[in-house]
Amino acid sequence: MRHKHGYRKLSRTSSHRKALLKNLAIAIIEREKIETTVPKAKELKRYIERLVTVARNADFNTHRQVFAALQSKEATKKLINEIAPKYEGRNGGYTSIVKTRIRKGDATPMAFISFI
């Protein structure tokens, strides 16, 4: 049984899931709005909100911690220098998920996830 399980598996191995979330996080940081499936968007929301909370500190160790999660210099710089300062006075709730459509090929519910 999966009672009180802490995260969505997304039908992937742990390494595949980590790579997926990292790539989706880089995409939303670069574009600030992406379309993905609803379960992926919900899991990405948890992942990216933790990163933004860490990035608000903006010291040297924060750069290292964010880079360790993203492995992208450009995304790390943009998150720490542009995105995180917007949310200085806000405690969480940096992203929003808007359900959009049902994908034609496999009837999967899709959603936009974007920074507020």
UniProtKB/Swiss-Prot annotation:
Q: Does the keyword Kinase apply?
A: no
Q: Name one Pfam family in it.
A: Ribosomal_L17
Q: Which GO terms describe its molecular function?
A: structural constituent of ribosome
Looking at the record's lineage, which domain of life comes first?
Bacteria
Looking at the keywords, is Disulfide bond present? no
Single GO biological process annotation from the record: translation
What Gene Ontology cellular component terms go with this record?
Answer: cytosolic large ribosomal subunit
Q: Kindly state which keywords UniProt assigns to this record, in alphabetical order.
A: Ribonucleoprotein, Ribosomal protein
Task: Supply the Gene3D superfamilies for this chain.
Answer: Ribosomal protein L17 (3.90.1030.10)
Please give the coiled-coil regions recorded for this protein: none
Spell out where the chain crosses the membrane.
Answer: none
Subunit-level organization? Part of the 50S ribosomal subunit. Contacts protein L32.
Q: Which family does it belong to?
A: Belongs to the bacterial ribosomal protein bL17 family.
Name by which UniProt lists this protein: Large ribosomal subunit protein bL17
Q: Which organism is it from?
A: Aliarcobacter butzleri (strain RM4018)
